[in-house]
Swiss-Prot record:
Name the record gives this protein: UPF0060 membrane protein Psyc_0916
CC per GO annotation: plasma membrane
InterPro entries (alphabetical): UPF0060
Family affiliation: Belongs to the UPF0060 family.
Pfam families: UPF0060
Location, primary (coarse class): membrane
Keyword ATP-binding on entry: no
Keyword match Cell inner membrane: yes
């Protein structure tokens, strides 16, 4: 799988996980409709399925995915919560993405 496809799949996977956690949060903490649990559960099912599509060992996938998840969560903070990320949020996201790239794309024999 190409690097671009891998990162794109990580981003979609992170979006599914974040949405799957955010929707129950809205019900529990903000008094929104209990019906949000249905799309939340479906989103988490999609998240698990998407993780299974990654072409490398599960442990490596989970470790690298964390870097993309961090960046997607900061993007969610900005676009959904309306909170502008700080410089340190952005720096941390970039560091996490560099870590993801090293884990996923470094040459290896196995």
């Amino acid at each position: 799988m190409s690097e671009l496809k891998t990162v794109g799949l990580f981003a979609i996977t992170a979006l599914a996980e974040i949405a799957g956690c955010y929707l129950p949060y809205l019900w529990l903490r903000e008094g929104k409709s209990i019906w949000l649990l249905i799309p939340g559960a479906l989103s988490l099912v999609a998240f698990v399925w998407l993780l299974s599509l990654h072409p490398t060992a599960a442990g490596r996938t989970y470790a690298a995915y964390g870097g993309v998840y961090i960046s997607m969560a900061i993007l969610w903070l900005w676009t959904v919560n309306g909170i502008r990320p700080t410089t340190w949020d952005i720096v941390g996201s970039v560091v996490a993405l560099i870590g993801m790239a090293i884990i996923m794309f470094a040459p290896r024999s196995v």
